[in-house]
Amino acid sequence: MNDWMPIAKEYDPLKAGSIDGTDEDPHDRAVWRAMLARYVPNKGVIGDPLLTLFVARLNLQTKEDKLKEVFSRYGDIRRLRLVRDLVTGFSKGYAFIEYKEERAVIKAYRDADGLVIDQHEIFVDYELERTLKGWIPRRLGGGLGGKKESGQLRFGGRDRPFRKPINLPVVKNDLYREGKRERRERSRSRERHWDSRTRDRDHDRGREKRWQEREPTRVWPDNDWERERDFRDDRIKGREKKERGK
């Protein structure tokens, strides 16, 4: 955790495919392809890579003159190359701009990213092909950034920096504390339920006691008890006579 950086200092296809750079296994075939790829930067590319910017998400109608007009505000431009399709000659939507001075590169990197040119919000980053060790281009499953719709997001660059990894010990402690809190709440709930049941029983006992106090146990006098017994016996004898007479 102490050496965590949002921007990759060295390109690792496996880490680039992970939102926090901690994946241990590739999650798609493109990552596998990038891990197996061996890429050598184009030696035919000229210019100082440390003074060169990568400009992407350009309107396909944007021309070199427009780019020069915008980016010359930050300093003197030595070279500007708008990448075009070799067959059709149409723009591919990205360019490389080399400045004469480092301060111009830094200023353009800081201020030009997110500018709107010909109704398109552009993306500006340093050139990575010749400056980032281990670089693998997107066509081989690597690259950085990307759109969600493409399903091939790559992290560790300016467009999509790594997110800080979750501190697992902290998470475990939080879960432990949460579990203890839930157990305490359940215990309190049981205690409240038990107290409620106890109060109900006490209430019932009290009500029964009050009823008993209001209605004392009936005590039969001896003569009343004898009359009740004689009355019951007479009813039984009368029923027997009636049944014999049928």
From Swiss-Prot:
Q: Where is this region: Disordered?
A: 187-217
Q: Which UniProt keywords apply?
A: Isopeptide bond, mRNA processing, mRNA splicing, Nucleus, RNA-binding, Spliceosome, Ubl conjugation
Q: Which CDD domains match?
A: RRM_snRNP35
Where in the cell? Nucleus
The record's account of tissue expression is: Expressed in heart, liver, skeletal muscle and pancreas.
On the tree of life, the source organism's domain of life is Eukaryota
**GO terms for molecular function, please?**
mRNA binding; snRNA binding
Q: What are the RRM domain coordinates in residue numbering?
A: 51-129
Q: Which Pfam families match?
A: RRM_1
Gene3D superfamilies referenced in this protein's UniProt entry, alphabetically: 3.30.70.330
Where along the chain is composition biased (Basic and acidic residues)? 192-217
GO BP term, example: mRNA splicing, via spliceosome
Provide a GO CC annotation, any one.
nucleus
What the entry lists under PANTHER family is as follows: U1 SMALL NUCLEAR RIBONUCLEOPROTEIN 70 KD, U11_U12 SMALL NUCLEAR RIBONUCLEOPROTEIN 35 KDA PROTEIN
Q: How does it assemble?
A: Component of the U11/U12 snRNPs that are part of the U12-type spliceosome.
Its name, as the record gives it, is U11/U12 small nuclear ribonucleoprotein 35 kDa protein
